[in-house]
Structures are given as structure tokens and as C-alpha cells.
Amino acid sequence: MRYEEINLGYEKNLVRYYLTGYDRVAKFYHYNPWNTRSFYDRADYLKDKSNPEALYNLLSFYLKDFALDQKVVENLDKIKKGAFIVLTGQQPGFLTGPLYTIYKAVHAIIEAKRLSELLNHEVVPLFWIGSEDHDVEEVNFLYFPGKEGPQEIKIEFTDLRKIPAGLRPAEPETVEAIEKFEGLLPNFDYKEEVFTEIKKAYHSANLGQAFARLMLKLFGKFGLLVYDGLNPEFKRVTKGYLKNAFLKRDAIEKALFKVYTEQQSLGIEPQLDPCPNHCNMFIFKNDERIALEVAGEKVVSRDGEVSFTREEFLEFMERYPEKLSPNLVVRTSIQSLVFPVLAYVAGPGEIGYYGMLKEVYEIMGTQMPVILPRFTATLIEPRVEKALKEFALLPQEIYQDYDGVFHRVLERLDNLGIDDTFKALKESINSAYKNLQEKLAPLGADFQKLTGENLGRVMAQVKYLEERAQKYHREKNSKYIEKLWYLKTNFLPENEWQERVYNVFYYLAKYGFALIEKLLGIPFNPGKHYLLYLE
């Protein structure tokens, strides 16, 4: 696969500084990702911090229900022998969600291999499945490139309660959405093979299980481990850490408010809003995930239907850890207390929220790992590349100023010089009316006003004529406009980067599962954007 590395900027200050001016934000992180020494320091810190045997048992217990490639089994054995982990993760989106989920897994696998060689110590990739997330709007859709632009497939769930994705059954609504997706796709070369695997993944499964099956299908032969934080065994293992987070809730709240204020003073938009009185955890009630808050001496659910005294809640935490769920603020540090996380492969948003959690990690008695910025990418199909060449355009031009590109191309196609012609006409009319007003000034102010009003009506007619000329011009060049729209919907579908919208299974149905191996053959660098040319 041909590829090209380019630079695309970020609007958010913190991410931009993290990538190109790290010193300005270094105070918010424990390790500098751009300094190789950081990985040695992190490895030294991790020594003797975890129990490899217990970690192996934890992962094996979860993975025993899945068909595992030999490479996954080998990496589990490496965990047992003290391997470090490159971690990444995402909610279990529909058919893995947007492309960036795939890129996270790819980058974690690549970094694990690179860091193993750098440190001369085994490092394995692990994908954390955020099945506890209860926002159905995050996991109930996918987009793919349609004939007229982005096409959406949505799972029409009938149960809209705050049920974690890992407790939401895939059948029947998700299966119906898959069938709709299959029916809308052209008969691509690999379509049948791909949809056979998709249907196997979602058969008799919840969304978390189906996601895990798909990720293991795509990346198992490359050794990617997966783990679901909703697993009851993980709750039991981590109940002491969650209890510690509750006991130190006040200190965590103060730390968040402190960094929030500090980042605002530096002109950085904080990624997390501190929530006063939040317990930093949720309770599962009738399968719904409800936030817990402190109200005086009590712990209450946000819906007001559950209430504990402090002592009762501590007892509940001890007896029923599987009924509690950490929020993002404390989940990340709990992950680092359980897993020997050498580095975390983070997207732009994650870089932002990790930048608010350094002191939370310290309160919890640990450090955050090296935060590695995930590469970003654009898949460019042959037809897209052909259109770029036809208009002599660079992809970054479309990313940075599509509207400007659109108008420049239309101007190039305008051999009549419509803009210049009407500009000259308007200047000529304005000049003529100015001369007229000067010559007829003796007729008085009322006549001057009448002349001005008349000019306004004339210019309105000129504007109308110009708009009609532009309309005829666009219609005459409609095929070029359609190609420009095609380019936009490939690079900026829904006005977002391609990787944040389109789903990988459209491309797998067209180019085959070998596409994954091709991605893993590219030496991606952290924080860079790549143009990936499909063939």
C-alpha cells in the first residue's frame, strides 16, 4: 500500500501543544512521549508493580469464551512472564464504529512491537472495550460512502434506557441493521466473506461480546488482546481501588477543579468539566447505569431512587462490586493499577482528558503511562485519487479549505469570466450614478435620495442576473461539481475527518481482510496524518 505522511493541524490548543510544543503542557503529564528516555523510565517504574500470574488469570478467564488465534495465546503467556502492555480502547461501536477504532488497534500493535525491541522486554497490545458506557447514541450507528454522500445505518433500539452496551443484546435490532447494511452495499468482491464473519460475531451476543469477536477476527492473528471492563471478575479485583477513589473523593474533586482553572488561565479548553459532589462512579439498577452523588452524609443515585449512608455504601462496595462502575476520571488510574501499562495510544480527545488527570493518578497512588498520540489517516480509493489529479488538488487543501477549493475550481472552469464581468459592470454602474448625482445635485436632496434608491434597484437586478449566470454556469459544469462533492464526502463526510465517520467494513467488503495486514505494514509515527492509497 502506498502511503504519504502529511501534517494537519488541530484546533484545540492542548493537543496542538502536545504534538508540536510539548514543553507548554508538560506539567500536565508524567512522561514526555517524544523522549525515548520516558519509555525506559516507565519500564523501571512498572517493575514489580503488578502480579503477572493474577493478571494472566484475569485475562484468560475473560478470553476463554472466544476463539483465539495462536498469537493471542502466545501473548497471554508473555503476560504471565511479566510483559508490559500498550493499551488503547473504545466503546463497542456498531461493527467497531468509525475507522479510528481500527487505527487505535493498529497503532497499539505497532507500538508494542517497537517498544519490545527498544526495551528488550516483551510488550503486548491490549484493547480495552468500554462496554460499561450507557450512551446508546454512541454505539447505534455507522456511516459508509454512498452514491450521493455519507449513508447512515442506524440500529433502532426499542429500549432506550441507560443500559451499558455490554448488557444490550444484539438481537433482533442489530441483526436487522446488519441486513440493511448488507442490502445497500454493492456486490463487492469480499462482501459475502465479510458479512459471514459479521453475522457470526453478532449471533447470540451482546454488543460488547460482538465487538470483541470482531476485533479478535481482525487482529487476533497479530496478537491483540481484548478485555471488557464490564467483566464481573474485574470488578472484584478492583473493588479496593474503587473504594479508595470514594474515600479520596474530596481530594480528587479539588484536583480536577485546580487543573480546570489552570488550563483555562493558559487559554486551554479543558476536556472535562468537574462535577461537584459526583462520586466518580455509577450504580447498576435494573440494568441501567445511574450516576452516584454525595448529598451531605449520604450517597444517592442521581435519579433519587437509591440512598446509602456512608457506612452502608462502603459495605455495599465490599459485597457487590459488580454493581458499581467507575467513571472516566478514576477508571484510567484503576486500569494502570491493574495492568502494567507502558503506554496508552490516545486520540485527540483522550490526550485532552488525560491532561487533566495527572494529580488524580497521584492521589490513587500511581502514575499515568506514556500517552502516545494515535496516528490519523485517510483512505484514498483509486477513483478519489483520479479526481484529485483531474483538479490538480492536494488532499490537505480539501481538509483545510474545501469551500475555497470549490470556488477556485469553478473559477478555473469559468471561461466567460463571470465574476470579473459583473464586477466591472457594477463598478461602471456605480461610477455612472456617481457622475449623475454630481451633475444633478442642484435638483436638491430629495432627487439625490431618489437617485440612490434607483441605483439600489438597478444593482439588485444586476445581482439577480449575476446569480442566474452563476446558476447556469454551475448547471453547465454539474459533472465537475458532483466530483468535487464526491471528494468532499470522502475526505470530510458530515464535515468531519473521514476516520471519525466511515466504518471499516465498507472497505473490507471491497478490498478484503488483507487490508488490515497492509495497514500493519506501514511504519506509522505518533501524531502524524497519513494518506493511504488503496488499490
From Swiss-Prot:
Pfam families membership: CC_BshC, Rossmann-like_BshC
Domain of life of the native organism: Bacteria
Gene Ontology MF, one: ligase activity
The enzyme's E.C. designation: 6.-.-.-
InterPro entries for the chain: Bacillithiol_biosynth_BshC, CC_BshC, Rossmann-like_BshC
Coiled-coil zones: 420-477
Keywords for this protein: Coiled coil, Ligase
Keyword ATP-binding among record annotations: no
Role of this protein: Involved in bacillithiol (BSH) biosynthesis. May catalyze the last step of the pathway, the addition of cysteine to glucosamine malate (GlcN-Mal) to generate BSH.
Family of this protein: Belongs to the BshC family.
Name listed for the protein in its UniProt record: Putative cysteine ligase BshC
Protein's organism: Carboxydothermus hydrogenoformans (strain ATCC BAA-161 / DSM 6008 / Z-2901)
Lineage: Bacteria, Bacillati, Bacillota, Clostridia, Thermoanaerobacterales
Originating gene: bshC
